[in-house]
Amino acid sequence: MRDVIAGMIIMAVSIPISMGYAQIAGLPAVYGLYGSVFPIILFAVFSTSPQFIFGVDAAPAALIGSALLGMGIEGGSKEALEVVPVLTFFVAVWLLAFYLMHAGKLVNYISAPVMGGFISGICMTIILMQVPKLLGGTAGTGELPELLEHILETAGRINFPSLMLGLISLAILLTVKKVAPKFPMAVVLMAAGAVLTVVLPMEEWGIRTLEAVKPGLPQWKIPDLALLPLNQVITVSLSVAVVIMAETLLAENNFAQKNGYRINDDQELLAFAAGNLVAALTGCCPINGSVSRTAMGEQYQGKTQLMSIVAGASMLILLVCGTGFIGYLPVPVLTCLLYTSDAADEG
């Protein structure tokens, strides 16, 4: 029963987090929800970890978003919708190759502090990208100078209602996390944001909301593998696959040591490959192990991969029956939920 409850809470909290990371990867927000169904269920089937959770996460999303920028492809465009699944497919191919080469043992030679520094850098980049959204503008892109320039430009035309809503949301999240860490404040705040959009003139105040999402499941199709030059695909997909392997295996082994069990590193690579393959076939960005979601499952005393299966099945039901609320979610609230998720993954 605890696994079921933990799975449903993970699903609910994953809604804003996954949507935010999907946008960072250059996809419409709903693709974050698509990536929270079949990929995590398939990972649960193949994984030897009883508790680790797969999902749309910071590092792969940021790397894919950066790659799109380097290719001159606008995030959210039709071209991005075609290119991202191609990159995800080749990430899955690399992860399968790592499995066949028994490359899981290589993670023992990766410095945890170096990997931690790399992830911290990605999280900081994501935070800087999202600051303009807190001020009422659009997300930033590019390197540090471009990000800072966009923040300053947005600050010149700041929308104070957006900023106030964001700061209040962030203060509530951080306070509740400190005094009542088990309380699912992210879920409550998301619901409260939707209610505020209904009862208050958010649009008149200049507070942006997410685009409405029609109910339904993702379309399954094989990506157009000839869409990009092979050398470009190999470079981007290999870097993402290495990050997924290193970050997720290091985190999985940390949880395993903490809780007194062992995982099969090579079998985990097969699970990563399977999850990313189905992500590619449903148009999603690469999927990664999530420290924040796993810690949440542990916090609610989840013990088995039933958590992942329940989370994925619950998200499937939501996509079929209940996506109407998404168009009422205020962007500043979503941004703050993303900030706290970044902090959890960095920690």
State the predicted function of each range.
Residues 342-347:
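A short, hydrophobic C-terminal helix/tail in secreted or cell-surface proteins
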